[in-house]
């Protein structure tokens, strides 16, 4: 699920530049061919949102020599699930997703913009404000919840329409299809061996599918959460992340350009 966020048109007729900013899922299992692709892209900086527990479970990022890695772990309590990232590591081991019902997926996106990840997202924007950090990759485990919300905030800051932001978010369903379908089957198989009633098995299967198959209301919940707390997404960027008009203008100058 690694892809360029560039190419999108902005409301003021500019275009997000390609070859500068990439969003991704985990990077520990890169093949030699993948490493060569990163080298060819000239990636200088990788921002990693994974927690220490996730890194222990998944492994450290495998990166070309000379790439700077910045660790900004996003953890915390989400939807009344203490230390949700660690709990998800366990769910992925056992196939038991009953602590993460379908409603979790909208709540996690809302929580990410109402306190859980403000410090990390603010730091990401500071990194993006420095041209010497480009080209840059930021990632979490699957490139979906934490990375998807970060991308939505970034594209919004670059003046990309929300319909386009939503489309980019849902694109992960296509880019991850070959990975997700067998993963769902594997998790359902793990869960089937656990002592659950038929009703619990059905609810657990629904939770697994809701977690791995993205819906538009997930990313809309990030926008709605910011609106509920701050009044607008722009106000969240300003008050929650410390992005004033000058910083946003600088970011747009760095990563958007007039269309030919």
Sequence positions of predicted segments:
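Cys-dependent protein tyrosine phosphatase-like superfamily
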Residues: 1-137, 142, 150-260
């Amino acid at each position: 699920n690694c892809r360029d966020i560039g190419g999108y048109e902005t409301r003021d007729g500019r275009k997000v530049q390609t070859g500068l900013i990439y969003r991704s899922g985990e990077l520990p299992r890169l093949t030699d061919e993948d490493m060569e692709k990163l080298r060819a892209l000239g990636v200088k900086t990788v921002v990693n949102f994974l927690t220490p527990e996730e890194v222990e479970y998944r492994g450290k990022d495998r990166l070309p020599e000379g790439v700077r890695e910045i660790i900004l772990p996003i953890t915390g309590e989400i939807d009344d699930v203490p230390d949700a990232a660690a709990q998800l590591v366990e769910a992925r081991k056992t196939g038991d997703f009953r602590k993460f019902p379908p409603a979790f997926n909208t709540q996690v996106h809302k929580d990410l913009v109402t306190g859980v990840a403000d410090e990390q997202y603010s730091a990401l924007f500071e990194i993006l404000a420095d041209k010497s950090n480009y080209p840059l990759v930021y990632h979490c485990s699957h490139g979906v919840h934490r990375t998807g919300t970060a991308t939505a905030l970034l594209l919004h800051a670059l003046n990309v329409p929300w319909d386009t932001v939503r489309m980019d978010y849902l694109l992960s369903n296509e880019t991850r299809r070959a990975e997700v379908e067998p993963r769902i089957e594997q998790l359902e198989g793990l869960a089937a061996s656990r002592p659950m009633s038929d009703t619990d098995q059905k609810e657990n299967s629904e939770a697994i599918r809701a977690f791995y198959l993205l819906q538009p209301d997930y990313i809309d919940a990030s926008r709605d959460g910011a609106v509920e707390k701050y009044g607008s997404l722009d106000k969240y960027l300003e008050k929650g992340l410390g992005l004033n008009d000058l910083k946003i203008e600088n970011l747009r100058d760095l990563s958007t350009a007039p269309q030919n």
